[in-house]
Amino acid sequence: MMSMFDGLFADLKQARESFEPALSPREIGKITSVATGIAKVSGLPNVGYDELLLFPGDIYGIAFNVDEDEIGVVLLGEYWHLQAGDEVERLGHVVDVPVGDSLIGRIINPIGKPLDGKGNLGTTERLPIERPSPAIMDRAGVSVPLQTGIKVIDALIPVGRGQRELILGDRQTGKTAIAMDTILNQRGKNVLCVYCAIGQRASGVAKVIATLREQGAMEYTVVVVTEGNEPPGLAYVAPYAATSIAEYFMEQGRDVLIVYDDLTHHARAYRELSLLLRRPPGREAFPGDIFYIHSRLLERATHLSKELGGGSLTALPIIETEAQDISAYIPTNLISITDGQIYLSPALFELGILPAVDVGKSVSRVGGKAQRAAYRGVTVDLKLAYAQFEELETFARFGARLDDDTLKIIEHGRRIRACLKQPEFAPVSMAEQIAVLVALTADLFDDINLDNMPAAEQAVRDAAANITDDIVERLESTDKLSKDDKAVILELARQALETFSTDTDLGEPR
């Protein structure tokens, strides 16, 4: 009997000596107050700036204001059930987001929660949403074009891979349509896309997603969504989370396109949070660091050097202007940060000129270096002719008597504008664009009635299907458009236009 107890005590002693309690320290604070999208927390003296906190109901928050006795927290979820006295736990790390190939084709929110009902994302790899932008010596120049499939942009305002090109204009002028056309045109071009909807209406986001699915673009696209009825904290972190997802692919040597739709809502969300947290307001009530939140975001878009894989991240931020005022605070900030802008004019939109790109107010500062040589050979004269037309058209509206040369310039310009029109979700291939541009610069459309221009332009595009593969390869290379290739394209265009009316009334306003 004693030997049995001795054995039992020996086992207990051995277990006691080998036992190592799995203690995990936790820092717990308490909510002192809750407001719209924010909370004040006390009792966490060691918390760091931007650190992630856990609230009851698995709601996350970011330590935004770190004061001596209290923390201002931006909430990243529904906060209606939170109240003063609830416990808050430090998590010891910053906000991160899941990344990886398994995200392609998925719809998520900025903290990685799937919204498409397809289950878990199937990835364990995560990246912080805030990451430093690449160093200067880690970057390469913008040298490869990003074809948008939109004639007026690819010809006159070209975009390169690794560029930041701002899209701005009043509401309902086609800004999202420009971005969507660009995404649709990346099909088969080895470019991954990330579409970030920031504070958008649910119906608008649903329409975008439906279009991506119908056109087969979800096969190479990740969608990050925050809706307008969600807390402003989610809208604030959304573009940073989307950029980290895109950077993962860029750092693998891949080309990525990211669309921020739109940064006006992002700026307003940040203004709302800053005012609620009692940060000092500045111009238009925006906080003093409003420029910095966008510059540190857009500086992450770049073309990496060959040593780092040569990947690229092209950014198309969208901004909404009010009453065509591009000199307002947020638009001028973004214009100064980006490498150019595409301005959409309400006046052109109302006239049915779509896309409503105002070429005179649009510019691409670095994209011209990346534009294919075949474009450069035909667009130099086109830009000059279109600029002259826009200037002279103003005088023609006042009924001024114009000489024959001026009337010819105006009629030619009207045909340029007619050829640059394009319906949405109908990207045009490079060969078709070159064929139309070559025909324009050779004045082949000048004898065609304006009413017949859409059909004539389509006929030239259809004729471009007969361009031989070797010519198409040269067009898509860095070679200039040779005289022989140009002659072949011109002959195809002439044959396509033979059946159209040559009835024109020079000088008659249309």
From Swiss-Prot:
Site positions per UniProt: Required for activity: S362
Membrane-topology annotation of the record: Peripheral membrane protein
CC per GO annotation: plasma membrane; proton-transporting ATP synthase complex
EC assignment: 7.1.2.2
Name of one Pfam family that matches: ATP-synt_ab_C
Molecular function as annotated in GO: ADP binding; ATP binding; proton-transporting ATP synthase activity, rotational mechanism
SUPFAM superfamilies: C-terminal domain of alpha and beta subunits of F1 ATP synthase, N-terminal domain of alpha and beta subunits of F1 ATP synthase, P-loop containing nucleoside triphosphate hydrolases
Residues engaged in binding ATP: G169, D170, R171, Q172, T173, G174, K175, T176
Disulfide bond annotation, renumbered to this chain: none
UniProt keywords, alphabetically: ATP synthesis, ATP-binding, Cell inner membrane, Cell membrane, CF(1), Hydrogen ion transport, Ion transport, Membrane, Nucleotide-binding, Translocase, Transport
Reactions the enzyme catalyzes: ATP + H2O + 4 H(+)(in) = ADP + phosphate + 5 H(+)(out)
Compartments where located: Cell inner membrane
Chief location: membrane
Signal sequence, renumbered to the chain: none
InterPro entries: Alt_ATP_synth_F1_asu, ATP_synth_asu-like_sf, ATP_synth_asu_C, ATP_synth_asu_C_sf, ATP_synth_F1_a_nt-bd_dom, ATP_synth_F1_asu, ATPase_a/bsu_AS, ATPase_F1/V1/A1_a/bsu_N
PANTHER family hit by this protein: ATP SYNTHASE SUBUNIT ALPHA, MITOCHONDRIAL
Family the entry assigns: Belongs to the ATPase alpha/beta chains family.
Protein's recorded name: ATP synthase subunit alpha 1
Lineage summary: Bacteria, Pseudomonadati, Pseudomonadota, Gammaproteobacteria, Oceanospirillales
Designated gene of the protein: atpA1
